[in-house]
């Protein structure tokens, strides 16, 4: 069963799920949410029903990955693209699997033409994100291997889920986050006091 939970932003994306169900009749596709966002209750139900959380995101909008943290807090192993903030959350081989991807538009030595157009105000944010997404290639064989690994090994699935839940408690629990903010404020205040009023 493929359970999708979230917000389908347009009819094209909604149609892709219809096409998926048509092309793979042996696959049961269930969606929570849709053209309107899933409710908090629906999200909790989806996490409770899931065995694995998969987010093969391919765009710049996934800079942190709150949904990944929610899945880890729910004790689910995570399969996510090795992209932006996801790689800071998922420990490859320990709390889940990171699927390699490449940004075909990115160059090492200078900003891409697309990034330059955005910086100059010639492209808006939505267009830039959309066009960048077209240039990101996900390793589909690695995604398939990660899914098969977790589906064929309930023990590994459980161990990764447990490790993810522990990681959340250690690094991302509200008590930890508040303590880190307090420490940052103390450091910033010390810098301000050292340099005097501006």
Walk through the language-model features, giving the residues of each.
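Short hydrophobic beta-strand element within catalytic cores of glycosyltransferases
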Residues: 77-80, 90, 97-98
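Short glycine/serine-rich donor-binding loops of glycosyltransferases
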Residues: 65-68, 86
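Acidic, amphipathic alpha-helical patches
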Residues: 17, 40-44, 86, 143
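Short acidic alpha-helix that forms the nucleotide-activated donor recognition element
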Residues: 38-50, 73, 91, 109
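Acidic donor-binding loop of glycosyltransferase active sites
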Residues: 45-62, 76
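C-terminal amphipathic helix plus adjacent low-complexity
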Residues: 116-198
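Conserved acidic donor-binding loop of glycosyltransferase catalytic domains
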Residues: 56, 81-82, 99-100, 105-107
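Nucleotide-activated donor-binding/catalytic signature segment of Leloir-type glycosyltransferases, i.e.
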Residues: 14-39, 52
């Amino acid at each position: 069963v493929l359970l999708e939970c979230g917000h389908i932003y347009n009819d094209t994306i909604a149609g892709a799920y219809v096409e998926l169900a048509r092309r793979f009749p042996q696959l049961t596709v269930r969606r929570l949410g849709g053209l309107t966002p899933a409710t908090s209750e629906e999200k909790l139900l989806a996490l409770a029903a899931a065995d694995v959380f998969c987010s093969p995101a391919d765009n710049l909008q996934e800079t942190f990955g709150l949904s990944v943290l929610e899945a880890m807090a729910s004790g689910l192993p995570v399969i996510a693209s090795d992209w932006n903030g996801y790689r800071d959350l998922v420990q490859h081989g320990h709390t889940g699997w990171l699927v390699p991807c490449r940004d075909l538009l990115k160059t090492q030595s200078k900003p891409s033409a697309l990034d330059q157009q955005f910086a100059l105000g010639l492209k808006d944010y939505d267009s830039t994100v959309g066009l960048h997404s077209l240039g990101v290639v996900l390793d589909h064989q690695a995604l398939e291997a990660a899914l098969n690994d977790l589906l064929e090994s309930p023990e590994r699935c459980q161990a990764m889920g447990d490790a993810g839940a522990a990681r959340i408690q250690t690094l991302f629990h509200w008590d930890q986050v508040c303590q880190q903010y307090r420490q940052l404020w103390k450091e910033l205040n010390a810098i301000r006091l050292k340099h005097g009023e501006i």
